[in-house]
């Protein structure tokens, strides 16, 4: 079985945050702490190294963890961050989570590691109803395929998953761990619920 220490994890914070009014989502505060701090706290308990993918406010993010930026222009979405994370990783297996999901499961890394098969390229979380495409674990061997995918202008992460050996990791018992906060209204509502 793959061990958590044999993986590294990248928090995706490189988007444009258009639904958050352009504010950098990872740095937006929830109950006095930046959203990214919640994600870091959850991952830090799981015995993995953490990197952040960001394309602005780099100094702010570097206060939390090492930062890698997209090398493809024009914000290619989560795949740009996945590409940057894979390209700069020191491990063969690299996991990715979004910066705006404060309730990541305490055993997220362990579940992903347990689901790896010998021929797996990519593992994707599934909440029992929906695929959670940016909660994912990639093997570095996907990098050439990902680069070709991005170079031809493809941006839909689900299409890449169809080109690779993709497994799904069951989180049907913990669907709330995928709550993500995309708008100021969602942030306010979530903060009130806590």
UniProtKB/Swiss-Prot annotation:
Binding site for Mg(2+): 100
Catalysed reactions, semicolon-separated: Mo-molybdopterin + GTP + H(+) = Mo-molybdopterin guanine dinucleotide + diphosphate
Keyword line: Cytoplasm, GTP-binding, Magnesium, Metal-binding, Molybdenum cofactor biosynthesis, Nucleotide-binding, Transferase
Enzyme's top EC category: transferase
One GO biological process term: bis(molybdopterin guanine dinucleotide)molybdenum biosynthetic process
Residues involved in GTP binding: 12-14, 25, 53, 70, 100
Listed GO CC annotations: cytoplasm
EC code: 2.7.7.77
GO molecular function: GTP binding; metal ion binding; molybdenum cofactor guanylyltransferase activity
Keyword Metal-binding attached: yes
Record's subcellular location: Cytoplasm
Cofactor: Mg(2+)
A Pfam family hit: NTP_transf_3
Family, as annotated: Belongs to the MobA family.
Function: Transfers a GMP moiety from GTP to Mo-molybdopterin (Mo-MPT) cofactor (Moco or molybdenum cofactor) to form Mo-molybdopterin guanine dinucleotide (Mo-MGD) cofactor.
Oligomeric form and interacting partners: Monomer.
Domain description: The N-terminal domain determines nucleotide recognition and specific binding, while the C-terminal domain determines the specific binding to the target protein.
Family annotation (NCBIfam families): molyb_mobA
Protein name, as recorded: Molybdenum cofactor guanylyltransferase
Native source species: Vibrio atlanticus (strain LGP32)
